[in-house]
């Protein structure tokens, strides 16, 4: 059966978007707010109608992720910021495999996310309450699966409890995208053997987005 590289690329961009947001948060203490909203909202939608629907139904919502994906796929340097993004992306993929193979872990994750949906009736998605709740899910359900993702950035920034919560919530969104990536036929071998297909697909999607003014 032929693989749907459009859906695979969208889901991969979702992982990369989380990686980029984590990097921004760790170095600057803040990140692209619109992209963060899209990523966090993807955690909540448990029954999407399509891959694109997970990310709000618009390709433009994944602009940050698509641009990051191109950087990761074509990274010639193993040092610096691109190396960080590649490490975060691959680490999220490894953790997703551990999540999917751990008995009962996906059920536990689903139950905890249902709890988030109830909280959303009273609190905003990016409120400290929701951020803390999503971070707690990451700490309780994902972190024990190991190995832990080492987030690098400004030590002063990373000491902030609010930034720590946002980073963990964003990593949870990355896990969500990695689960989706496997569901639509993604696999790590594609990063080696289908790099050109993924690059072409990402460029095609970006090409018909309206330019940012």
Curated annotation (Swiss-Prot):
InterPro entries: HflD (IPR007451), HflD-like_sf (IPR035932). Transmembrane segments: none annotated. It holds the Pfam family DUF489. It is found in: Cytoplasm; Cell inner membrane. It comes from the Bacteria. Keywords: Cell inner membrane, Cell membrane, Coiled coil, Cytoplasm, Membrane. Residues 79-126 form a coiled coil. One of its GO terms (cellular component) is plasma membrane. It is a peripheral membrane protein. Negative regulator of phage lambda lysogenization. Contributes to the degradation of the phage regulatory protein CII. Acts probably by holding CII on the membrane surface, away from the target promoters, but close to the FtsH protease. Interacts with CII protein from phage lambda. Belongs to the HflD family. NCBIfam families: PRK00218.1-1 (NF001245), PRK00218.1-2 (NF001246), PRK00218.1-4 (NF001248), PRK00218.1-5 (NF001249). This is High frequency lysogenization protein HflD. The gene is hflD.
């Amino acid at each position: 059966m032929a693989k749907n590289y459009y859906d695979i690329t969208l889901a991969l961009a979702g992982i990369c978007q989380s990686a980029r947001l984590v990097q921004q948060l760790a170095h600057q203490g803040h990140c692209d707010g619109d992209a963060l909203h899209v990523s966090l909202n993807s955690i909540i939608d448990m029954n999407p109608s399509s891959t694109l629907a997970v990310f709000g139904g618009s390709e433009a919502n994944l602009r940050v992720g698509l641009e990051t994906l191109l950087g990761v796929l074509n990274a010639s340097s193993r040092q610096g910021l691109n190396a960080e993004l590649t490490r975060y992306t691959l680490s999220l993929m490894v953790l997703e495999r551990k999540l999917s193979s751990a008995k009962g872990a996906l059920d536990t994750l689903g139950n905890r996310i249902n709890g988030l949906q109830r909280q959303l009736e009273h609190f905003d998605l990016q409120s400290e309450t929701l951020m803390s709740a999503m971070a707690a899910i990451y700490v309780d359900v994902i972190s024990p699966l190991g190995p832990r993702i080492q987030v690098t950035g400004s030590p002063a920034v990373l000491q902030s409890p609010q930034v720590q919560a946002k980073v963990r919530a964003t990593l949870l969104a990355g896990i969500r995208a990695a689960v989706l990536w496997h569901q639509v036929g993604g696999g790590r071998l594609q990063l080696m053997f289908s790099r050109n297909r993924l690059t072409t697909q990402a460029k095609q999607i970006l090409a018909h987005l309206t330019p940012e003014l």
